[in-house]
Design a protein with these regions (language model features):
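A solvent-exposed beta-alpha-beta segment
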Residues: 2, 6-12, 157-229
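A conserved beta-strand element that flanks and buttresses the S-adenosyl-L-methionine
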Residues: 20-23
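A short glycine-rich, Lys/Arg-flanked "PGG" loop and its adjoining helix->strand segment in the class I
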Residues: 35-52
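Short, glycine-/aromatic-enriched active-site segment of Class I SAM-dependent methyltransferases
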Residues: 53-76, 80-82
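Conserved S-adenosyl-L-methionine
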Residues: 92-103
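Flexible, glycine-/basic-rich loop-and-beta segments that form/coincide
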Residues: 103-148
Length: 229
C-alpha cells in the first residue's frame, strides 16, 4: 500500500540499502524539485545500478499535438537536452534513450552514475539532441495555431449537429483538458460515459457534464460519440 511504501523509504536511512535498478514511469514531469529527486536516485543506486524512467516528451507533444497532456499534475515538460543538464548536475549520465508513442509521445531514458561501468550510446543520444536543436520559437507558435484550429473545428461540429444526441466517451483527465479548452459544456454534450463505476452520476469539472455507464449510453443510442480518452 501507499502507506507501507512511505514507511519503507522513511526507514531506508537506517541501513545501507542500494538498488541495482530503479524505475520511474510517468512521474518525472510531476516533480516540483527534479534536482532533489535525482540526488535521491543517486544516493539509492548501487555504484553500477541503473535508473530507467519514461516521461512525456516535449518535441513529440509539439509534433503530435497532444496538448491534452498539459494539466495541473504535469508541472514540467522536458526534452532530452534539459533532462541531460539536470542528470549531469546530480552526477548521473544518460547511457541510452529511445522514443515511443506512449501517451502521444514519450521518451524512455536509462541513466547510471557518472563513474559507473556503463558506456553511453552516444550515436542514439546525439541523434535525439540534434533533432531537438531544430525546435525554435516558431515551433511553439505553430503548435498554438494548430490547437486553435482544433478548437474551432470541434466548435463548428458541435454547432452543426446541435440538434443531434452527442455523448462523450471517456471521463478522463485528458478529456477534461479538451472539454475545458474548447469551452464544451452540458449544453453541447448530453452525457459522458465511462467504465469506472465510481464516476457514475458524478459531473465533469468545469464543463458540468453528467457521467453515465457505457450500458446506459448504448440504451440512449447517441448519434455521435466524442472520444475523450
Amino acid at each position: 500500500s501507499k502507506k507501507n511504501i512511505f514507511k519503507f523509504f522513511k526507514k531506508k536511512g537506517k541501513f545501507n540499502l542500494k538498488f541495482d535498478m530503479i524505475s520511474s514511469f510517468a512521474i518525472f514531469y510531476d516533480i516540483e524539485n527534479p534536482n532533489r529527486f535525482c540526488e535521491d536516485i543517486y544516493n539509492l543506486l548501487d555504484e553500477n545500478g541503473i535508473w530507467i524512467l519514461e516521461f512525456s516528451y516535449l518535441p513529440l507533444m509539439l509534433k503530435n499535438l497532444t496538448f491534452d497532456q498539459i494539466c495541473h499534475e504535469h508541472v514540467t515538460y522536458y526534452g532530452l537536452k534539459t533532462f541531460k543538464k539536470i542528470s549531469k548536475k546530480n552526477n548521473l549520465k544518460i547511457i541510452d534513450a529511445k522514443l515511443n508513442e506512449i501517451n502521444g509521445g514519450s521518451i524512455e531514458v536509462t541513466c547510471a552514475k557518472i563513474d559507473s561501468k556503463f558506456k553511453e550510446s552516444k550515436n542514439k543520444i546525439n541523434k535525439i539532441l540534434n533533432d531537438e536543436n531544430k525546435i525554435t520559437e516558431n515551433s511553439f507558435k505553430k503548435f498554438n495555431s494548430r490547437i486553435k484550429k482544433i478548437k474551432k473545428d470541434i466548435s463548428q461540429f458541435l454547432k452543426k449537429y446541435k440538434q443531434k444526441k452527442i455523448i462523450g466517451y471517456g471521463a478522463s483527465t485528458k478529456g477534461n483538458v479538451v472539454l475545458n479548452y474548447c469551452s464544451i459544456s452540458n449544453k453541447d454534450i448530453s452525457y459522458i460515459c465511462d467504465a469506472n463505476k465510481f464516476k457514475f452520476n458524478k459531473y465533469t469539472p468545469g464543463s458540468n457534464i453528467k457521467i453515465i455507464s457505457k450500458n446506459k449510453m448504448r440504451v440512449l443510442k447517441p448519434d455521435f460519440l466524442l472520444v475523450l480518452i
